[in-house]
Amino acid sequence: MYRIPRGDISPARRFIDNKQEGVYPVMAKESVWTKLRRKVDKEFAEELQRQQEMERTAREEAKALEKQQKKEAAIAAYREKRDLTVADFFRIADLPLPDDFADIADHTISDFTADPRRLTPDSIFLYWGKSPISAGDPASVLQMAIDSGCLCVISIQPCTHPHTLLLPDTTDALEGTNRIREAYIKASAYIRSLHKAKVITVTGSVGKTSTKEMIEAVLRQHYKNPLISKGNNNSMFSITRNIQSLKRTTNVYLQEVGAFAPKTIEYSARQLAADIAVYTNIGVSHIESYGSQEALTADKLSLSTFGKPDGLAIINYDDPILMGHSFTQQVITYSLKNPQAMYYAKDILRADDGYTFTLACRAAAEEHPAQIHVLGEHNILNAIVAFAVGRALQLPDAEILAGIASYQPSGMRQNLLQAGKYRILADCYNSSLLAVDNTLKVLDELRLPDETKRIVVLGDVLALGDLSEETHREIGRVCTQHKMDLLIGYGIAIRYAIEEAAAAGMQAHYYADRAEMEAAVRAAVRPGDIVLFKASHGVNLGASMDKLFGTDLNESSAIGHKQFRIEVHGDFEFYIFENSASLKTYLGHDAVVEVPAFVTATVTDELHETEVTRDLPVEKIGKTAFRGNEEIREVVLPETVVRIRDGAFQGSGLESLDAPDSLLSIGARAFADCPHLTTVNLPEATDQLGDAVTENSPQAMIMYR
């Protein structure tokens, strides 16, 4: 039955009432009810959604506020502990605060250092007879501190700085404990303790830096801003500087640690409190200072002894000395090929630019295909330990393997590069018997045309003490097992290696004079040949490499590691190196400038350990030599210059340059942005031009004479 209700109520209300009574109007009215219900449901749902969204927003805002408050509280707590006043530093370092320091006691310090070159007006300087420039006499070191205007000086020697704490009797005769050095270590260890960053250390007689760089390649796949020690900056002084650069947000800190003299690694270990200590091997490097391999080993093991008790020691299973010692931390082993180690390689195949191999993890019964794009099987070992470190940090396997594959050597460590018509294998930052053998293996593996000569230039392995002659003779015998057409030796003890090689029938020649060695290389090398340079850093073989082939590796490294002095001679400011000078900046205002060929300076001959006065050839025109100098129109370069570095004349008023016959290379943008430049006249020998050499110099033409 259908009934249309009457009465003084709305049609919608009557419709709903009828439905509840089971009385329905005509079918056309059904759509009215449906539309109304939809409207009500939609409004209800929208209101519910708005309320839920408001509640969710309120919760998120409250959560964000709480997170921000916690972050601000954490930052405040961190800054309260990290921002040290002078009084705080003396308390942490366990030193007495002199009464006459009252006026600076509440002054916030920027840093503390033993390097007077790095002092600022807010620094504290500590001097106990050792510093990164300890070759200088104490008076000059302390004068640098005074001139810096630093806050105060803590010194073993009298000092005229107005705020000086003099501790002349600083060494305990029985314990050998130096109070100032101990203060330095304690303050550094305190700052380390404020940070949650995982600390990874790398030490060993050979391969520290290349291993560190392989691990770095892995870390950079995962972490945005890991703190990594630069180059081979591995002394306690560099470590203290790095520790002070730690941030609250730093996740991981990778530090190479070097051995120099008894207890130097122990001092570093106490500062670092390593979570992971990586050991490459134990050889005889620096044994001259330690007296025995046992003493050297004991010092290296201190990285674990003073590391975190729940940390890891990752050791080379192939090194019998390491395997013969016990460690205070849990031990992880790695090997090139030994399946008894926890990590090792198998199925190694040579590729065009490196190797493919299977990385096996014995404990987890896993295998991973891996590759590296660098020659030398020892780099596979570096990749294996980098994988072990990544696993210890619980990084994804894909990221670890990608990091290993991305590694490329640089600088003066097994760096294969093209220098004009020649190929160079630069590996002269450090050396040892094992390192020489490894590098010669890389040279063996290079696929070269039959007519290409392999020329090897070797220098001394330093700091061997009584083992020097026998080690160098063994190096000579090792050379006979490798591919080379000519062996050239420069240095002192390297003559023993040349004697052994020559006795075996090799073409081998020894030179005690650097200029004679350079002349021999120049006479022997032909376009297409490859030349290997290998020596301890103190031999400074890289300087000869730069001079002979116009490379920039040695000078860039020296500047980066602050291994130079700056001197002003007339209108010229020079970088002073051991064997050469480089024009840093022209200070004058002349339109026509003639650069001197030589600079007389006193330098340290590291190989012979003497101070000498030399006429240093000006071999490089530096990056800021004439940059932005709009007054110059003509520059005359001497016949000693072999390289014009990046940007040397950029943005200058130079009109033309007639380069000397000695010039071999020009860096990137060297003559860019020079509106008046018309010609750069080059000799045929200049066969290395960087990118964009004359960019934005509209009239400039490069011409060969």
Annotate each language-model stretch with its function.
Residues 43-48, 176-317, 321-330, 390, ...:
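Phosphate-binding loop of NTP-binding sites
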Residues 76-77, 202, 411-415, 440, ...:
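ATP-dependent carboxylate/acyl-activation modules
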Residues 1, 10, 24-25, 571, ...:
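Structural signature of tandem-repeat unit edges
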Residues 27-186, 477-478, 482-492:
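N-terminal leader/targeting and accessory segments in enzymes
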Residues 96, 122, 155, 159-163, ...:
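Acidic, Mg2+-coordinating active-site environments of NTP-dependent enzymes
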Residues 129-138, 142, 410, 428-506:
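Active-site beta-alpha connecting loops in nucleotide-dependent enzymes
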Residues 561-586:
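Short beta-strand/loop segment at the start of cytosolic alpha/beta domains
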